[in-house]
């Protein structure tokens, strides 16, 4: 790319096809891992593997990034993953931050909600950011990694696999060539070519409704909130969603009904009056992008097929209500990359990848359930359902119990893998949400004189968190803690102390001051408490007192060396 990060028009960039030396090799070149698809999921997976030192090849059949109406809502958990990949700050700096949402029935506000009601978190509940910016920032991060190669205009046209590996037929503007690989990650979207070549399908429910997306550039004084209308006077008997993107662009979704003509509804003479009815005829705006879509909630039966792993839209799909598509895809990458990295390094058995399948199938089912419920509430299919919905909305203004029933899209939250075989079950009493399998939560900390965030000190490796009391650690305790870094799968050690304290004789260990006491509070920790986090920042074990043998056993379990390979749900 020739444009700078500050002024790149990511929708206009074209990436030149370049002939690879693999195309001139006398025999097919073998790669350890090949990823198909340079969208957010493929790029995130490739960056994660490359950061682990795994030489990675990424193939894409196009020569440009996404354009127009794609994902725009990126959740707090996804931003934390982007932090770990080295580009989260760029997303937040560019994106429109929001925590608040409002729901209207007709033209009356029913209630508002705050998706991040407590302070002390490094990121907001959501940012709105066009997908082409997300892809652009990920791509620029990828280009910083010398062991990550991207080949544009390389299309997968054939695929065969055996127990020993995979052979790919690749089409380019200069003809076809063959590649071999140990593992293939299919992140090539809802119309996955890899899935088709294997004769696999996604099954589920297609919803009989149509929606119009209008991305509108305008100067407006709307607050940076998510506004959702049921049956508004400017668009009767349907729903409308409005929220802001960067660059003065606003996303407006209009429900149209199944009988709407998708071609006619995209025409400006249809779109402009709808937008004017919402904004007022005096508001000046330009149409940036218009599309009409239908959607389905579906998934593959399983996400691991031999040596092929499916992630993102190639594996599962949901309705747009709740921003669960791109966010769940990035969380697929987060779950997959550390496991595949350990397998490729010989530090874990191949059966560890079975837990990618079981954990992320479980997450997909959660997302599909929530997405389906949202869709059923937003688009009632009969008079009884509509009567229930409208009565709920009428009550919600004054009755808190009814607000819990209003569903304008249950917004994306990460899954807790409570039944994962990688967890070591509690033997001590704990309170709170940080159970084994839960995504770790954030809190403010201080390192030396620098204020920072707890989660930014974790990830990319197993992390041990010891809550100290500021007193001198015994030689035996310190030696046992330090031994974790010498295990076959090393553990990065963090010591958490109360504000203003310093643990003594801890050499170069990272000492985190719990400046507001929120780390201890959110993890229900006391002096001596120890947590073990996975490389994807999910809790896998915790104890009230440190026991080196127990931690080493938990580490073996979390890397697939103990117990079964599949979670039961």
Task: Give short role names for the model-derived ranges.
Residues 2-36, 51-52, 105-108, 136, ...:
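Helical substrate-recognition/capping region of FAD-dependent monooxygenase/halogenase enzymes
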Residues 10-12, 246-248, 262-328, 348, ...:
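FAD/FMN-dependent oxidoreductases across multiple families
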Residues 29-31, 174-183:
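Core beta-strand elements of the Rossmann-like FAD/NAD(P) dinucleotide-binding domain
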Residues 38-39, 131:
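Glycine-rich Rossmann-fold phosphate-binding loop(s) that bind the pyrophosphate
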Residues 152-166:
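A conserved short coil-to-beta-strand element within the FAD-binding core of flavoproteins
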